[in-house]
Amino acid sequence: MAPAAAPSSLAVRASSPAATPTSYGVFCKGLSRTLLAFFELAWQLRMNFPYFYVAGSVILNIRLQVHI
């Protein structure tokens, strides 16, 4: 079985400028980089991610819904 690729590498391939032309400009690029950084961090810490999720939610006082 082939090893699973990191989600960020898949997202980078899927979000190349040639594949999806957008007019959001710099904001979209910055947001995409931020989201990719968080997805990469979540992938690397996938065993400990629930603990970081709870701690981050408590610290930032954010109530996020996760549908499984």
Swiss-Prot record:
UniProt-annotated stretches for the region Disordered: 1-21
One of its Pfam families is DUF4560
InterPro entries in the cross-refs:
SMIM10
Instruction: Look up the signal peptide feature and give its range.
Output: none
Q: Which GO terms describe its cellular component?
A: mitochondrion
Q: What is this protein called?
A: Small integral membrane protein 10-like protein 1
